[in-house]
Amino acid sequence: MQDRTLTAEVTPGDEITVAGWVHEIRDLGGIAFLILRDRSGKIQIKFEKDEMNDEIVQTGLDVPRESVISITGVADDEPRAPTDVEIVPTAIEVLSSADTELPLDPSGKVNADLSTRLDNRTLDLRKKEVKAVFQIRSEVLRAARDAFRELGCTEINTPKIVATGTEGGTELFPITYFGEEAFMNQSPQLFKQLMIGSGLERVFEIGPIFRAEEHNTPRHLNEATSIDFESAFINHAEAMDACEYVVTAAYQGVAENCITELETLGLRDGFSVPDESFPRISYQEAIERINATGELDEQLVWGDDLPTDGERALGADVGSHYFITDWPSEIKPFYIKDHDDDKTLSTGFDMMHPQMELVSGGQREHRYEHLVSGFEQQGLDPEQFDYYTKMFRYGMPPHAGWGLGGERLVMTMLGLENIREAVLFPRDRQRLSP
């Protein structure tokens, strides 16, 4: 429809054609109003029954809500209309008629549970609050991409079907690949590192990851979006600097470019961009501060992973984004480098929101012999990862990086109760369709 005008661009006095969904119809007797909705907003269509063609009136008032229609008419000033403008139609066409009974109410007047919403995601997205979440998500990814480019990164796309898992273990989805066993990739980690050895030096990727985790919680998914960064010739502290930069840029992009969406969600007044200097807390300090809160039934000891309740207790204590550094080597992956002066401490770090972990990263082990030793210490066969390890014999620079959960970033940024609200079509233990 080349002659179509968006509702937000309608100017009084013009004869225009608008098209969209029937949001609401109000019949007041001699006069009736239809509210038309498109991606830019809404506009009022006025039907004066005694002064208009009967066919136009009947078509406009009999069409079911959420049908798709096209209307041609003259736009007039009308201060009482929702947008101060209304259209008096001279022609109307029903492009697609909707069922009279819908599985949920896109106007939002009748609430639906999350399962019903996800079963009917297309209808759900017609609600302005839901659409706002995904417009903000789009801005988060755009801002992250721009930030990576400002850091001198090259965008890459790594395989999602692999012969071996990044970290081994059971959190893998097996598939049959032309008669051979293969897996859906749980992380682009190993391929990112290969790109460091290629000479690209600094790369990023925004793409899907797959984890066959049994978790069924409001913050876990089995298919998620990972925002990944890897750079040569930096250490773990400089990788944390880059993490702060990208996360802050995402918030800044939303603050500058999503004012309407934040207003729709009731978040504009309270939305703030974090300072680009997150506190850095050692693992030892973290467990001491968690224990001091008294929130856990049992005290944490060195070598324990941090439970969800512990993360929340520490987050409430810190009150902002922060890093946990200097984790025990024994609980970090084989590719994370240890500190040179203390082999019991890794250079691994996690970046936390007060509610949950967002980022995992660290300096990588770039020395071939140490890398192979790390495989063996974690019970992995280095021969199965030969495509990866052999490149470390050909000249691999020191490097560091991280991976950021895209959905978790949006979830925590907007205060969503369930991570599935930040995904168009979530994949979890119960949901494979739509």
From Swiss-Prot:
Compartmental location: Cytoplasm
GO molecular function, one term: ATP binding
Name listed for the protein in its UniProt record: Aspartate--tRNA(Asp/Asn) ligase
Residues bound to ATP: R211, A212, E213, R219, H220, L221, E357, G405, G406, E407, R408
Listed PANTHER family: ASPARTATE--TRNA LIGASE, CYTOPLASMIC, ASPARTYL-TRNA SYNTHETASE
Residues that hold Mg(2+) 3 according to the record: E357
GO cellular component: aminoacyl-tRNA synthetase multienzyme complex; cytosol
Gene source species: Haloquadratum walsbyi (strain DSM 16790 / HBSQ001)
